[in-house]
Amino acid sequence: MTNIRKTHPLAKIINNSFIDLPAPSNISAWWNFGSLLGICLILQILTGLFLAMHYTSDTATAFSSVTHICRDVNYGWIIRYMHANGASMFFICLFLHVGRGLYYGSYMYPETWNIGIILLFAVMATAFMGYVLPWGQMSFWGATVITNLLSAIPYIGTSLVEWIWGGFSVDKATLTRFFAFHFILPFIVSALAAVHLLFLHETGSNNPSGIPSDSDKIPFHPYYTIKDILGALFLILVLMMLVLFSPDLLGDPDNYIPANPLSTPPHIKPEWYFLFAYAILRSIPNKLGGVLALVFSILVLAIIPLLHTSKQRGMMFRPLSQCLFWLLVADLLTLTWIGGQPVEHPFITIGQLASILYFAILLILMPTISIIENNLLKW
């Protein structure tokens, strides 16, 4: 009798994706982040669902409903902080996952890569709207500043912003619709993640050496299931350390002040995972230019496959490209730091230089260095 997992229509899909899937024998821990992102997404949906049971999306009661969750709901505090810090873990895994893709040339699977970029935008949109929901000072002013950026769009800008707001300022209508979108988007993200996997399994996984691994495959289970479980345990350990020891480490204290349209906080800044993009936005004096740079800072990933000039897929055997890659990482850390600083000298100049360097590395230096490396191979 044939095994039911290989014949049953539903079990067959799971079997071909997670059990009998032929995987390269040499993929490293950098390939763990896909499964970790899946775990993060499930965790966020579950904690979010329980938070939504107690949250009210009304300007008069939103802040106090979050307080009520933390004070009065059984284990409400841990659910709330797991959700808030779970978002941070989600983005850490996302950045490492994208970084892995850049380093090892995983962008050479264009469908998987492009769905990944759409996923990144969707998760960023979800996180932004989630940050508005507690209706603290940073929630309100963050929503005001970021939605206001759309007014830079010529001709339709102002009408578009008022349409998104549902009025002439960020108010009750804005909060209600943001809650609705924040609730539905993670399910759209789940569907996109399934498509992401579908395209990945069409080609099979990349591996650190960057050469085809068809001649040397091993079954996903038990080898990579156990490896993923180890990664998951480490993820949960770090998350729970954050939640139980310093839950507000990555948050902004201003968000414990209820939203007040009449009082602007001294420094309006988004959550840490948006700071690099925020720094790029601020480093351009022109409003429309800043918005375009902000969008392009993520969208630039879409043209990376077109700029691949190297004869090798990954950077494993390309020391010059490796140096450039780690310079890019340092540059992104610099941008993240600048995004959290006030707009004054010397931070403005550092931000502008870091922004120029970011685009220069991705668009000019990487392809150029790859050509130089190709020529070095001939020596």
From Swiss-Prot:
It is found in: Mitochondrion inner membrane. It is a multi-pass membrane protein. Pfam families: Cytochrom_B_C, Cytochrome_B. InterPro entries: Cyt_b/b6_C, Cyt_b/b6_C_sf, Cyt_b/b6_N, Cytb/b6-like_sf, Cytochrome_b, Cytochrome_b_C_euk/bac, Cytochrome_b_N_euk/bac, Di-haem_cyt_TM. Heme b b562 binds at H83, H182. A ubiquinone binds at H201. One of its GO terms (biological process) is mitochondrial electron transport, ubiquinol to cytochrome c. CDD domains: cytochrome_b_C (cd00290), Cytochrome_b_N (cd00284). One of its GO terms (molecular function) is metal ion binding. Binds 2 heme b groups non-covalently. The chain crosses the membrane at residues 33-53, 77-98, 113-133, 178-198, 226-246, 288-308, 320-340, 347-367. One of its GO terms (cellular component) is mitochondrial inner membrane. Its main location: mitochondrion. Changing A125T: In strain: Isolate MME-K2. Keywords: Electron transport, Heme, Iron, Membrane, Metal-binding, Mitochondrion, Mitochondrion inner membrane, Respiratory chain, Transmembrane, Transmembrane helix, Transport, Ubiquinone. Its cofactor is heme b. Changing I304V: In strain: Isolate MME-G1, Isolate MME-G5 and Isolate MME-TSU1. Heme b b566 binds at H97, H196. Component of the ubiquinol-cytochrome c reductase complex (complex III or cytochrome b-c1 complex) that is part of the mitochondrial respiratory chain. The b-c1 complex mediates electron transfer from ubiquinol to cytochrome c. Contributes to the generation of a proton gradient across the mitochondrial membrane that is then used for ATP synthesis. Belongs to the cytochrome b family. Heme 1 (or BL or b562) is low-potential and absorbs at about 562 nm, and heme 2 (or BH or b566) is high-potential and absorbs at about 566 nm. The cytochrome bc1 complex contains 11 subunits: 3 respiratory subunits (MT-CYB, CYC1 and UQCRFS1), 2 core proteins (UQCRC1 and UQCRC2) and 6 low-molecular weight proteins (UQCRH/QCR6, UQCRB/QCR7, UQCRQ/QCR8, UQCR10/QCR9, UQCR11/QCR10 and a cleavage product of UQCRFS1). This cytochrome bc1 complex then forms a dimer. This is Cytochrome b. It comes from Martes melampus (Japanese marten). The lineage of its organism: Eukaryota, Metazoa, Chordata, Craniata, Vertebrata.
